[in-house]
Amino acid sequence: MNGTQFIARILKEEGVEQMTCFPSNALIEEVSKEGIRPVMFRHERGAVMAADGYARSGGGEGFGTVMMQHAAGAENSVGGLSQAFGDNVPMLVLPGGYPLAERNIRPNFAA
């Protein structure tokens, strides 16, 4: 079992039924295999706003879940995330990433 499979399984066990996303994240295929419905968006902020709406419409049950690509994708989502944070909307945000070995910066450091 790798990291994405592990995360997908935990999300399923926690009751996640759908996840909004921008189509550039390795987790998308794994959540699909677990029976979680990925809902694709053309922009990260739209995906965040949909997850926000999903959480708000649940009547206090559950939370919104959104994933996007790293770097610019995470930056594009900040406006929607700020609004959700300001309104205390429960949301899980999973920005993607890439292996440290692919950064081409030696030595590789991780905080």
What kind of feature is each model-predicted range?
Residues 1-111:
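N-terminal alpha/beta PP-like core and its mobile active-site loop of ThDP/TPP-dependent enzymes
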